[in-house]
Amino acid sequence: MADWVTGKVTKVQNWTDALFSLTVHAPVLPFTAGQFTKLGLEIDGERVQRAYSYVNSPDNPDLEFYLVTVPDGKLSPRLAALKPGDEVQVVSEAAGFFVLDEVPDCETLWMLATGTAIGPYLSILQLGKDLDRFKNLVLVHAARYAADLSYLPLMQELEKRYEGKLRIQTVVSRETAAGSLTGRIPALIESGELESAIGLPMNKETSHVMLCGNPQMVRDTQQLLKETRQMTKHLRRRPGHMTAEHYW
């Protein structure tokens, strides 16, 4: 049984009509960057809960979550309506294996995300531990519109902090926007456009690819890399070149 604790909302940041971030103070147990927990509210006499990844570094007591409002959702519209001072239930122990401990050493670590799935990478990069074993870090955030790239300022801040080791790239699929590639991640890999923009190759000799977000993107990218680059899923018992987390 999960141990639930009561958290207090300290900040609600509305990025767009649908995207928002919640900052919460709660007595949770220590977690590993890249992990997720569950948020819950009592609705009509029952606890409605969903899993959300931590965006904040584990050493930051401001627990941050990046959410999208599902119009007919049972929980997300209620979470979006919370105000500072309101209470929210949080599972105290984090879960998940989308963490650096599960990633083998390589020259270039590619971190690819769609939508709100940028969260785990931001947690990992803000903490900044266990990254010395990679020569290059690449963070790619794909969204429909440029307005949905909520954490671009933080990505740019991190890029400066890593002094050339981290390269960032945004992707939009429904419009063209300055500084962003246009299209979907699998197609941009297939055409070579993503590697060209970054200036690094994505191959099994030098790279490990982390994939987080839309299950279709994850599946399509895995299939493409398997077929065209002979890259394989990474398992503890059989090391490979791809680590993935589906976001729904």
From Swiss-Prot:
InterPro entries: Cbr1-like_FAD-bd_dom, FAD-bd_FR_type, FNR_bac, FNR_nucleotide-bd, FNR_type-1, OxRdtase_FAD/NAD-bd, Riboflavin_synthase-like_b-brl. Keywords: Cytoplasm, FAD, Flavoprotein, NADP, Nucleotide-binding, Oxidoreductase. GO terms for cellular component: cytoplasm. It is found in: Cytoplasm. The keyword Hydrolase does not apply. Coiled coil: none annotated. The keyword Flavoprotein applies. This is Flavodoxin/ferredoxin--NADP reductase. It comes from Shigella flexneri.
